Amino acid sequence: MSMKELAEHIIYVAHKNKKSITNLQLQKILYFTLRYSVPEIGLRAAIKTYDEPFLTTRYGPLIKSQYKRFEGYGSSPIIGDATQHEEYNALNKMILELIDKDVFALVASSKLNDFWKRHEDEIIKEGLMIQYPIEAVLKLDANNQERLVNYIFAEEKTD
């Protein structure tokens, strides 16, 4: 499980359903799919997937490696084969709903995150790309928030 595999799966779902997807759409769908993934795939899988941090940009969060990977398409749809990753099948409905949303509505919504808003001046005026901590990405209920804190604390103990 990784951000690369989630990106591949999102593209696969789009193509399988005869929908086009641009790089900007992919970035926003990556963000929202991971943000709301815990009820569908579980906290552990969401944490494992987040192996590369989102970075702040004027257009909301992006995963740099995946942005660079598809940068050559510009604003054109991403074409070519894509790989299904079955561990993300539970996210397919959400992915399809997000693909049908206006990309600039997704951009605007992604900037409503408290983390982005807190750093807005640095992002807009200085062009800083700041890493999102996982707790700023995942939308968690109180129980999962506590589990995330315990998980992070356990990881720090082993370092």
Positions of the model-derived regions?
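Domain-edge interaction signal
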Residues: 1-159
